[in-house]
Amino acid sequence: MSQTIRPSSVFDSVRTPFHVSTADGIDLIGEVSAPKGESKGAILCLHPLPTAGGMMDSHVYKKAANRLPAMTGITVVRFNTRGTTSEAGTSTGEFDNGKSEKFDVEAMLSYCFDHLKLENVWVTGWSFGTDLALQHAKDPRHKEGILWLLGASK
């Protein structure tokens, strides 16, 4: 692909909104951005802290969904954890500071493997998402984790 990449670049992919139910009855909303051809792998995106504005449509993950499927053949799975709102919608439930979000991560890993039949899945955590990945991404079927430990300084 020899196309210029700009901040607003959106490349062709198959975008599918979804709802997933957790073991404790929460309805999670999200979107799968898949390549038009065969998927070479996938990333499950765990977003930053929702009480500080983190969500599935955080700029880094939105750009990944807009570009990676076409550029690399990677499927990008994004979702809002419980009680989180983005332009894509709101997941039910309430933010639980990483405790009950365990069910969100487990449900999404199951969705990736059992429903989407994805292989070569990597979990990506950004800030709060890193905490979720380290604590709750225990499904042995995923490959590894890509963790972004970002913090603010004064």
Give the ranges of each region predicted by the language model.
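Gly/Ala-rich beta-loop-alpha elbow adjacent to hydrolase catalytic centers
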Residues: G125-A133
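Short beta-strand immediately N-terminal to the catalytic nucleophile in serine-hydrolase-like folds
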Residues: N120-G125, L150
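A conserved short beta-strand
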Residues: H142-K154
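Active-site loop/turn elements of alpha/beta-hydrolase fold enzymes
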Residues: P48, I74, F79-T84, A88-G89, ...
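Cap/lid segment of the alpha/beta-hydrolase catalytic domain
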Residues: G53-M55, R82-D96
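Alpha/beta-hydrolase active-site loop
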Residues: E94-H115
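N-terminal cap/lid segment of alpha/beta-hydrolase-fold proteins
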Residues: M1-G41
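Short, surface-exposed "cap/lid" segments of acyl-processing enzymes
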Residues: P35-R78
